[in-house]
From Swiss-Prot:
This is Cytochrome P450 315a1, mitochondrial. Member of the Halloween gene group. Pfam families: p450 (PF00067). Coiled coil: none annotated. Its EC number is 1.14.15.-. Keywords: Heme, Iron, Membrane, Metal-binding, Mitochondrion, Monooxygenase, Oxidoreductase, Transit peptide. It catalyses: 2-deoxyecdysone + 2 reduced [adrenodoxin] + O2 + 2 H(+) = ecdysone + 2 oxidized [adrenodoxin] + H2O; 2,22-dideoxyecdysone + 2 reduced [adrenodoxin] + O2 + 2 H(+) = 22-deoxyecdysone + 2 oxidized [adrenodoxin] + H2O. Required for CNS development: midline glial cells. Involved in the metabolism of insect hormones: responsible for ecdysteroid C2-hydroxylase activity. May be involved in the breakdown of synthetic insecticides. Belongs to the cytochrome P450 family. Complex coexpression pattern of dib (disembodied) and sad (shade) in the early embryo that restricts to the prothoracic gland cells of the developing ring gland during late embryogenesis. In larvae and adult, coexpression is seen in prothoracic gland and follicle cells of the ovary. In adults, coexpression is seen in the follicle cells, sad only is expressed in nurse cells. One of its GO terms (cellular component) is mitochondrial membrane.
Length: 520
């Protein structure tokens, strides 16, 4: 399989730059004349009164051009898909905190030190507000669409968040683990059968055991992630229905398309695309319509299947939400948004973890031995290392509800502060030898390898931390543990695999992972 890394020539780069500048100027003009600004797009005053400024350390500011700001610099660095690398370079230039107006429209403060990142969460307020994808915000406005927890604000968010905290994060969650293990075992057993079939036919030249290359790995992990959430919501028994299996196959495809269409709108102003009715917007809009409609239909069908089975239901989130007096419409909103959020984040977190493990054969052996003794310290360390090096959300954002003092710096009310997780996780002042995968660094007594544990915050902290982190961690633990115990894994990619940003951090090329039966 041939792998190619795209290397655009100077003419193509120049044309792309001119296109983006034209889009930016036209977009700003249309925004002023025809559209109200998005409600969360804020422009805080950055010039402080002299008496106030004298008390604080000034925040370095990246200078940009009128109208387009630092857009030219971003495009020269590879565009929006390389934003995490671009900001990483800025931190090396300006330090752990700086201010930049990206693209000439959004003023933001970027922070990368562990202490500053913790400070942001201490100032997030009772109802933390985070940046939302412009395309999704516009869609919700245009369609008067009520969405799940990710899009809620204020008292409505806090009420539903407290309910889900009790059900997904706190207390005895063994009922949930049963569903995760069942779905993971089903997928890994299928890999085991295919691997055994490949190993039964040795290579003619050398007689070595033939390996099995996992086909369509990204799609398989997407399907697994969505299946896990469906089982947690309704119980494993619903998967016995062929119609639900077929619906989940189709739902997986369209959820994946939402991710792809959202990614394209990262590099083009969604409001401009909507005004001009461009295909890039029409495709996104139609796809979101379909996802919301199909997600609601799956819920209705799962409920009917459970009623028809006339037997005690599996322990499931749906019944727990009902017992908490959550309305049926709200349950649908929560479920669909959980699936959309977990589809890509869990799938790509799992890909990165498998990739990291495939490069470490000795670590695979150690994990297999650890699993045989029912120990899990090394596995926990591997998961932390994978999330540190490959955070699927390389930035976490908060709008500060009040003026705040952060590490001797003054941050104005309503400023968007972005935590640079990609930079923080690879900072040698936080982690010794940060580019290496060293699971032992997280074991008790190995603190010399971890200078600042809060340099890695893949799920954020505070009131608005990731509601699905317990599910995601258990999925990773189950998947990696089973794979390490049953397979010898290797990476077949001949070219180096790097990360690019498409809503979340993804490999810049298709991962080619091969399995052989573990013989030790």
């Amino acid at each position: 399989m041939t792998e190619k890394r795209e290397r655009p020539g100077p003419l193509r780069w120049l044309r792309h730059l001119l296109d983006q500048l034209l889009v930016r100027i036209l977009s700003l003009s249309l925004f002023r004349s025809r559209c109200d600004p998005p409600p969360l797009q804020r422009f805080p005053a950055t010039e402080l009164p002299p008496a106030v400024a004298a008390k604080y350390v000034p925040i370095p500011r990246v200078k940009g051009l009128p109208v387009v700001g630092t857009l030219v610099d971003l495009i020269a660095a590879g565009g929006a898909t390389h934003l995490h690398k671009y900001i990483d370079a800025r931190h090396k230039q300006y330090g752990p905190i700086f201010r930049e107006r990206l693209g000439g429209t959004q003023d933001a403060v970027f922070v990368s030190s562990a202490n500053l990142m913790r400070g942001v969460f201490q100032h997030e307020g009772q109802y933390p507000q985070h940046p939302l994808p412009d395309a999704w915000t516009l869609y919700n406005q245009q369609h008067a669409c009520q969405r799940g927890l990710f899009f809620m604000e204020g008292a409505e968010w806090l009420h539903n968040r407290r309910i889900l905290n009790r059900l997904l994060l706190n207390g005895n969650l063994n009922w949930m683990d049963v569903h995760i293990e069942s779905c993971t075992r089903r997928m890994v057993d299928q890999w085991k059968r295919r691997t055994a079939e490949a190993a039964a036919i040795p290579l003619a030249e050398s007689g070595e055991i033939r390996s099995y290359e996992l086909p369509l790995l990204e799609q398989q992990l997407y399907r697994w992630s969505i299946e896990v959430l469906c089982c947690i919501m309704f119980g494993t028994s619903v998967l016995t229905c062929p119609k639900i299996q077929s619906s989940l196959d189709y739902f997986t495809q369209i959820v994946h398309k939402v991710f792809e269409h959202s990614s394209r709108l990262m590099t083009f102003p969604p409001r401009l695309a909507q005004i001009l009715r461009l295909p890039i917007w029409r495709d996104f809009e139609a796809n979101v319509d379909e996802v919301l409609r199909e997600g609601a239909a799956i819920i209705d069908h799962c409920i009917r299947v459970q009623e028809d089975q006339r037997r005690p239901h599996d322990e499931a989130l749906y019944h727990r939400l009902q017992a908490a007096d959550v309305p049926g419409d709200m349950i649908k909103r929560i479920f669909v948004d959980l699936v959309i959020a977990a589809g890509d984040t869990t799938a790509f977190s799992s890909q990165w973890a498998l990739f990291a493990l495939s490069k470490e054969p000795r670590l695979q052996q150690r994990l297999a031995k650890e699993r045989a003794t029912n120990d899990s310290r090394l596995m926990h360390g591997l998961i932390k290392e994978s999330l540190r090096l490959y955070p699927v959300a390389p930035f976490i954002g908060r709008y500060l509800p009040q003026d705040a003092q952060l590490g001797g710096h003054f941050i104005e009310k309503d400023t968007m502060v972005l935590l640079s997780l990609y930079t923080a996780g690879r900072d040698p002042s936080h982690f010794e030898q940060p580019e290496r995968v060293l699971p032992e660094r997280w074991c008790i007594g190995e603190t010399e390898q971890v200078h600042k544990s809060h340099g890695s915050l893949p799920f954020a902290i505070g009131q608005r931390s990731c509601i699905g982190r317990r599910v995601a961690l258990k999925q990773l633990h189950s998947l990696l543990g089973r794979c390490a115990a049953q397979f010898e894994m290797s990476c077949l990619n001949e070219m180096p695999v790097d990360s690019v940003l498409r809503m979340v951090t993804v490999p810049d090329r298709t991962l080619r992972l091969a399995l052989r039966p573990r013989t030790e």
